[in-house]
Curated annotation (Swiss-Prot):
GO terms for molecular function: ureidoglycolate hydrolase activity; ureidoglycolate lyase activity. InterPro entries: RmlC_Cupin_sf, UAH_cupin, Ureidogly_lyase, Ureidogly_lyase_bac, Ureidoglycolate_lyase_dom_sf. GO terms for biological process: allantoin catabolic process; purine nucleobase catabolic process. Its cofactor is Ni(2+). Its EC number is 4.3.2.3. Belongs to the ureidoglycolate lyase family. Pathway: Nitrogen metabolism; (S)-allantoin degradation. The keyword Lyase applies. This is Ureidoglycolate lyase. It comes from the Bacteria. Catalyzes the catabolism of the allantoin degradation intermediate (S)-ureidoglycolate, generating urea and glyoxylate. Involved in the anaerobic utilization of allantoin as sole nitrogen source. Reinforces the induction of genes involved in the degradation of allantoin and glyoxylate by producing glyoxylate. SUPFAM superfamilies: RmlC-like cupins (SSF51182). Keywords: Lyase, Purine metabolism.
């Protein structure tokens, strides 16, 4: 099956998580007016008394054409990925309880100035880079096991 890749927007992505970006977002000044603070852009949620981790993930580019055959989810915490050098990347997401609901499967491409924060329990493809090795600032949960993985029928990403 073919999965159309759409431009990432907060409206299209809201069921799956938050788009982390400054475009069309409110800010206030801090540090004597030298800094614009775009405040509270995503909900970080951590369950079971675990702690929030800030890491850097160095992702390798995916081989093209890209075929998706599995999704993962994290029931005990949100997970955010923010490219550190303005790289474009692709995310694949789906809703669903015990298994991904393929009728909700969507693929989005960022504009190079966006990150994503997956809500708890949102199915998503494991992180990969798009065109070159990419460092991602990652905010997620540390502690006990927090990753469910499910195989899905193969989906080939298609770009408009």
């Amino acid at each position: 099956m073919k999965l159309q890749v759409l431009p990432l927007s907060q409206e299209a992505f809201s069921a799956y998580g938050d788009v982390i970006e400054t475009q069309q977002r409110d800010f206030f000044h801090i540090n004597n007016g030298l800094v614009e603070r775009y405040h509270d852009l995503a909900l970080v949620e951590i369950l079971e008394q675990d702690r929030t981790l800030i890491s850097i993930n160095r992702a390798q580019p995916a081989n093209l054409p890209l075929t998706i055959h599995e999704l993962e989810r994290h029931p005990l915490g949100t997970q955010a990925f923010i490219p550190m050098k303005g790289e474009v990347f692709v995310v694949v997401v789906a809703l669903g309880d015990d298994k991904p609901d393929l009728s909700t499967l969507r693929a989005f491409i960022t504009n190079g100035e966006q990150g994503v924060n997956y809500h708890r329990n949102v199915w998503h493809h494991p992180l990969f880079a798009w065109q070159r090795v990419t460092d991602f600032l990652t905010i997620d949960r540390g502690g006990s096991d927090n990753c469910d993985v499910e195989s899905i029928p193969e989906q080939e990403l298609c770009f408009a």
